[in-house]
């Protein structure tokens, strides 16, 4: 077959072109989805493709990599959003455990167990217990206080702030870009930074 070149004015348009081509192959030309491969230049570009494929119920599998929303730097920011939007829930508990040490706060397994036990004894969720939690070690206690002081205003404003605004606040106030890249001055072409930019761009739609 001849090579076909399609132009698109946006990432979304490019993804829709791909969806149309895949549907044509699968519906009208006798191909199965497993016969079709999509190549892209950089990992951050998968976000729009994954969302478009999901919306159009096209099954896909990413070879030798993680789906966009499962990449660690993306997943941890989403966990922060879950804590902020719904702190006192089972989902909030799971998300809080995920971000306690993001960035590093040296909160070890023993301290986490103490927090879980305190929450259970009070019959509350982990975030509620965290607000009055007093670890024995002064340094850890200070880190816990700072985390609560950071999260609490955001939980109060969760329904007034836009998701993209919250992501921007998290990235700036936690120095998150430097944390995930382990670089003093993260560069825009770093794949993790590109993933975070894609997440923030996606969040502007909500």
Annotate each PLM feature.
Residues 86-92, 96, 103, 129-206:
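Accessory C-terminal helicase-associated subdomains
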Residues 6, 61-63, 177:
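General small-molecule cofactor/ligand-binding pocket signal
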Residues 23, 43, 50, 54, ...:
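Short, amphipathic alpha-helical segments that act as regulatory/interfacial helices
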Residues 1-59, 82-90, 155, 160:
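Helicase P-loop NTPase motor core
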Residues 2, 55-61, 66-103:
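Conserved short internal alpha-helix adjacent to the catalytic or cofactor-binding core
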Residues 119-132:
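A short beta-strand-loop micro-motif that forms or neighbors metal/cofactor-
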Residues 11-14, 18, 32, 42-45, ...:
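Helical mechanochemical/support elements of P-loop NTPase systems and associated helical scaffolds
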